């Protein structure tokens, strides 16, 4: 097909008109816009009756390919768009269709900031790292001093913070086998637990100490009271509870003091008898050897 340049605008006859069946389709382009026929145009030429010229594919002139929405998937047009519609009809695709949401912008900035923080290397000589390396050993010593095992600590933390804490977690923390992030998180929790445990332990030791001081308090028994107790012991070395109460009232002593005195007196009597029997046995044995 030879191309003839025209200065006027392009003219065309649509294929769906009544005269398209008898008249050939004549399209005129400028010499610079002539393109080889496409496969689609060849198919149209073979199927249309009375069409004796190959039809060139649609050419959008200077229009970028991004302007045509799904241009690659659409069938080529059989006419040429005017230049003014191609250059002024559509906005550039690289411009945002909607204004950017400020919330989304803030989210992106926060995401970039967090990614930078993660990528920053950890200073191994920082005071935080040194404290994190020293605390596990200190925690272990104080935990053992309070009488708690790793299992006790894991169960106590699991009851408050969930099942993610266990004996294995405490063991790995004390052996410096956790990641930096998890170790920092667990250090804060264990510090608080240790303070509470030491407070409870201090209260318990205070109560136990008071009970021990009360138990170790000794009662002084007068000589007259001892003589009276010795006489009662000679008569009955195992008095009943009523007899002990009566003796305590007579001697102006506590019932527990009288009861303990009789217990100690029986033990001393038993030791004396045992020692005496051993002495007699030794004497008898020596006497037999002399014979």
Swiss-Prot record:
Subunit structure: Interacts with PITX1. Interacts with LHX3. Interacts with ELK1.
Residue ranges flagged as DNA-binding region: 214-273
Gene Ontology CC annotations of this record: nucleus
Disulfide feature: none
CDD domains cross-referenced by the UniProt entry: homeodomain
Protein's cellular compartments: Nucleus
Motif interval(s): 9aaTAD: 5-13
Pfam families (UniProt xref): Homeodomain, Pou
Primary site of residence: nucleus
Source organism of this protein record: Sus scrofa (Pig)
Protein name, entry field: Pituitary-specific positive transcription factor 1
GO biological-process terms attached to the record: positive regulation of transcription by RNA polymerase II; regulation of transcription by RNA polymerase II
UniProt free text on domains: The 9aaTAD motif is a transactivation domain present in a large number of yeast and animal transcription factors.
Family stated for the protein in its record: Belongs to the POU transcription factor family. Class-1 subfamily.
Gene name as annotated: POU1F1
Domain POU-specific: start-end pairs: 124-198
Role of this protein: Transcription factor involved in the specification of the lactotrope, somatotrope, and thyrotrope phenotypes in the developing anterior pituitary. Activates growth hormone and prolactin genes. Specifically binds to the consensus sequence 5'-TAAAT-3'.
Native organism taxonomy: Eukaryota, Metazoa, Chordata, Craniata, Vertebrata
């Amino acid at each position: 097909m030879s191309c003839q340049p025209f200065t006027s605008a392009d003219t065309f006859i649509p294929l769906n008109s009544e005269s398209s069946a008898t008249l050939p389709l004549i399209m005129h382009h400028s010499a610079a816009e002539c393109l080889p026929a496409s496969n689609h145009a060849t198919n149209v030429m073979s199927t249309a009756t009375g069409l004796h010229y190959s039809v060139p594919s649609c050419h959008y002139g200077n229009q970028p390919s991004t302007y045509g929405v799904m241009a690659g998937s659409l069938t080529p047009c059989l006419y040429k768009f005017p230049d003014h519609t191609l250059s002024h009809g559509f906005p550039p695709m690289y411009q945002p269709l909607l204004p950017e949401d400020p919330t989304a912008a803030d989210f992106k900035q926060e995401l970039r900031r967090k990614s930078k923080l993660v990528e920053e290397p950890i200073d191994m000589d920082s005071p935080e790292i040194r404290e994190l390396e020293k605390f596990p050993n200190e925690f272990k010593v104080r935990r053992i001093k309070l009488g708690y095992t790793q299992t006790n600590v894991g169960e106590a933390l699991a009851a408050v913070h969930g099942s993610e804490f266990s004996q294995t977690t405490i063991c790995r923390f004390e052996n410096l086998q956790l990641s930096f992030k998890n170790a920092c998180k667990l250090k804060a929790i264990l510090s608080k637990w240790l303070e509470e445990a030491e407070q409870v332990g201090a209260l318990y030791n205070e109560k136990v100490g008071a009970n021990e001081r009360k138990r170790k308090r000794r009662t002084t028994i007068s000589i007259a009271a001892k003589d009276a107790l010795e006489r009662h012991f000679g008569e009955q070395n195992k008095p009943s509870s009523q007899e002990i109460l009566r003796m305590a009232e007579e001697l102006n002593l506590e019932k527990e003091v009288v009861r303990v005195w009789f217990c100690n007196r029986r033990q001393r009597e038993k030791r004396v008898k045992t020692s005496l029997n051993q002495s007699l046995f030794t004497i008898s044995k020596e006497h037999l050897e002399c014979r």
